[in-house]
From Swiss-Prot:
UniProt keyword terms in alphabetical order: Cataract, Deafness, Disease variant, Dyskeratosis congenita, Nucleus, Ribonucleoprotein, Ribosome biogenesis, rRNA processing
Top-level taxon of origin: Eukaryota
GO biological process, one term: pseudouridine synthesis
Name by which UniProt lists this protein: H/ACA ribonucleoprotein complex subunit 3
Classification lineage: Eukaryota, Metazoa, Chordata, Craniata, Vertebrata
GO function terms (MF aspect): box H/ACA snoRNA binding; RNA binding; telomerase RNA binding
Subcellular location, record wording: Nucleus, Nucleolus; Nucleus, Cajal body
Role summary: Required for ribosome biogenesis and telomere maintenance. Part of the H/ACA small nucleolar ribonucleoprotein (H/ACA snoRNP) complex, which catalyzes pseudouridylation of rRNA. This involves the isomerization of uridine such that the ribose is subsequently attached to C5, instead of the normal N1. Each rRNA can contain up to 100 pseudouridine ('psi') residues, which may serve to stabilize the conformation of rRNAs. May also be required for correct processing or intranuclear trafficking of TERC, the RNA component of the telomerase reverse transcriptase (TERT) holoenzyme.
Length: 64
C-alpha cells in the first residue's frame, strides 16, 4: 500500500491509503518520482521548462 492523496472542496490535500476518493475519483500518488543519476531525458525536460518559462531562475524574486 502506498500513500495517496486527493483534493477536497477547499483544495487541500487529504492523504489516504485508498485508490479512490469519496466522490469516486482516482487518487494521486503522494510520493515523488524516483531519482536516477543516469537520467537520459533531463536535457529535454530543462529545454521544455525554459520554453514555457517555468524554471526557478525564470520566476520573479519572492517578496520578503
Amino acid at each position: 500500500m502506498f500513500l495517496q492523496y486527493y483534493l477536497n472542496e477547499q483544495g487541500d490535500r487529504v492523504y489516504t491509503l485508498k485508490k479512490f476518493d469519496p466522490m469516486g475519483q482516482q487518487t494521486c500518488s503522494a510520493h515523488p518520482a524516483r531519482f536516477s543519476p543516469d537520467d537520459k531525458y533531463s536535457r529535454h525536460r530543462i529545454t521544455i521548462k525554459k520554453r514555457f518559462k517555468v524554471l526557478m531562475t525564470q520566476q520573479p524574486r519572492p517578496v520578503l
